[in-house]
Amino acid sequence: MNKQIQTEADELGFFGEYGGQYVPETLMPAIIELKKAYKEAKADPEFQRELEYYLSEYVGRATPLTYAASYTESLGGAKIYLKREDLNHTGAHKINNALGQALLAKRMGKKKLVAETGAGQHGVASATVAALFDMELVVFMGSEDIKRQQLNVFRMELLGAKVVAVEDGQGTLSDAVNKALQYWVSHVDDTHYLLGSALGPDPFPTIVRDFQSVIGKEIKSQILKKEGRLPDAIVACIGGGSNAIGTFYPFIKDDVALYGVEAAGQGEDTDKHALAIGKGSPGVLHGTKMYLIQDEGGQVQLAHSISAGLDYPGIGPEHSYYHDIGRVTFENASDTQAMNALINFTKHEGIIPAIESAHALSYVERLAPTMSKEDIIVVTISGRGDKDMETIRQYMAERGLAND
């Protein structure tokens, strides 16, 4: 394994050619303040202790690493272990980062938070920590996502957040990020931008990765305990890339195959997909340089996925870099493949995963049978499917997939 991999951003916030701080001058003081505060917090054992306390006592970590016996047997290949991020308080991996950033904001003396959300999971996690630490929160959410995720909108409001519908563009996650950044520019003195994925201007990709890498650290110690060795392959779904980078990061320098699974939507050959790596090219969006779905003229294209959490047109800078150097292999799953995997997995394991996570499972179903029974795959179940019940119900009804 190549030990020359760059695992931290350079002084200018780049991983290879990706990353940076493409923001208006008015935001630079806030970015500089955040970078300094984060560096201090990271080095402060007291901050780390407080974070660990809340992760354990409030979130319920460590999450289990569960051997999927029935699923493994049905696929007839590698042993499959599930990293159960669906068992966190609020039902997904998003809380790991929301909690860390809220503690950081509190340390910086910020009384208010602003966040964007797609599926609503990051919004719910942000509203949860805002309630916990008595902070105000404004959440920007695309109007299209609000329609898809009514239950999460109500959750956020019940928790005390103000949810603002974004009608611009496609009314999805990308548009919500634009609005959240604009809001932050004009409320920068008392507000922290609680960015939910491993993207945005430096230091956000690093901050989000560090708070999410608790996933990979736990996997490492748990699999060593259970199997006495590291896994052969690790699989995670990828939108902006926070659950995947958190899963992969502690294994970057190990001899472990890493697979990120993008959303192919209605198919690679259509224009309705979210394949930033698969069909995209490097460009700048939301303050960072990364792989983007864009046309020849550099216009960012609309992303599509049945999963509200994966329909983002970019993929974070660290993932973009790992793709270029060949450290992470990017695969994809279409809406249909993901939904079929979700239904199959649920029947075998009695666990209903989020549609996002089902994209990773779809690739596991292709990968596992090609491996031997001694091989080990770990797949991150990034969230639970409660929020997706209506989408799953509609999908099955439209296709006459009776629940027999």
From Swiss-Prot:
Q: Name one GO cellular component term.
A: cytoplasm
Q: Which residues carry this modification: N6-(pyridoxal phosphate)lysine?
A: K94
Which InterPro entries does the UniProt entry name for this protein?
Answer: Trp_synth_b_CS, Trp_synth_beta, Trp_synth_beta/beta-like, TrpB-like_PALP, TrpB-like_PALP_sf
PROSITE patterns assigned to the protein according to its UniProt record, in alphabetical order: TRP_SYNTHASE_BETA
Keyword Ligase carried by entry: no
Q: Name the Enzyme Commission number(s) assigned to this protein.
A: 4.2.1.20
Q: Which Pfam families does this one have?
A: PALP (PF00291)
Instruction: Give the UniProt family note.
Output: Belongs to the TrpB family.
Q: How does it assemble?
A: Tetramer of two alpha and two beta chains.
Function, in words:
The beta subunit is responsible for the synthesis of L-tryptophan from indole and L-serine.
Put simply, this protein is called Tryptophan synthase beta chain
